[in-house]
């Protein structure tokens, strides 16, 4: 494709600078087309690797799971959006041993406290408490961190942003008392019992019963993670599961660029197994920040 575009441009009198730009612009669709063709070829040569799973009626107490949404609280309106989003995910995944939490920071700032911070935090706490009154007392949580001074960035911000929130939350689940989560709303007594976390972005939807299905996969004996004491990493089984992530029809139609890179959109109820090139070839994939992981 690139060679054809270059030859066409040269025949029609394009100069070298313009020819270079044409080649560069052609590389984007050409690379995407090449990737799609290679993945389709591999999917025909190697069948999708389907992981064994348990057909669970509900999440067992020994596999208590919490869905976490790391995010930024920058307004009261944003708090309302997040609370509504969390409630929708919970209604699609009803289970007494499945919980939902917001892990939040304030936006980066040049000062430690901004006007309106207290109002936002009060609204967030009230929203989580209202959800617990409406549904169950141990269903929803809020874990919020105040800003810390970052010498390198020259800003007041949440420590290590998203990665820091998740890392500190894992420590909090294992009884750490020195995290920067200064505001904790919800029934904290269940935290030591949490075995798995499902991390989502604030714009990610969790399909109906998807959490239970993920737990059914990770708890299957053949999938349980084995950590090599010498290497200090998982050498057998899986410590992280990442389900297929697809783009909604509305998001894919947002622009030509989105249409090009969104791939298969929506949810296909008739698909039983989906090919992933890395998983099918190597038995492992690339984690993009959305999925289930074993806390331990």
Predicted regions, residues:
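Transmembrane helix-loop junctions in multipass membrane proteins, especially transporters and channels
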Residues: 10-15, 43-51
């Amino acid at each position: 494709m690139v060679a054809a575009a270059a030859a066409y441009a040269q025949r029609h009198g394009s100069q070298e600078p313009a020819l270079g730009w044409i080649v560069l612009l052609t590389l984007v669709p050409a690379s995407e087309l090449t990737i799609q063709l290679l993945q389709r070829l591999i999917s025909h040569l190697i069948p999708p690797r389907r992981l064994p799973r348990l057909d669970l009626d509900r999440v067992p107490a020994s596999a208590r799971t919490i869905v976490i949404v790391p995010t930024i609280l920058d307004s009261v309106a944003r708090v309302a959006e997040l609370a509504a989003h969390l409630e929708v995910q919970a209604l699609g995944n009803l289970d007494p041993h499945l919980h939902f939490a917001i892990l939040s920071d304030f936006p980066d700032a040049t000062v430690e406290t901004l006007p309106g911070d207290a109002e936002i935090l009060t609204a967030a706490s009230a929203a989580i408490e209202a959800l617990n009154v409406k549904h169950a007392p141990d269903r929803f949580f809020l874990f919020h961190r105040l800003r810390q001074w970052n010498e390198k960035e020259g800003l007041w911000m949440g420590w290590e942003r998203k990665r820091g929130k998740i890392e500190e939350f894992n420590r909090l689940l294992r009884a750490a008392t020195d995290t920067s989560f200064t505001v904790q709303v919800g029934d904290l007594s269940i935290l030591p019992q949490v075995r798995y976390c499902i991390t989502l972005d604030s714009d990610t939807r969790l399909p109906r019963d998807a959490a239970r299905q993920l737990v059914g996969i990770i708890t299957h004996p053949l999938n349980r993670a084995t950590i090599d004491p010498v290497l200090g990493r998982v050498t057998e089984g899986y410590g992280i599961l990442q389900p297929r992530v697809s783009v909604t029809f509305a998001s894919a139609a947002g622009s030509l660029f989105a249409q090009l890179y969104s791939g298969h959109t929506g949810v296909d109820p008739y698909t039983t197994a989906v090919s992933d090139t890395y998983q099918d070839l190597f038995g492992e994939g690339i984690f993009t920040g959305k999925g289930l992981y074993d806390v331990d």
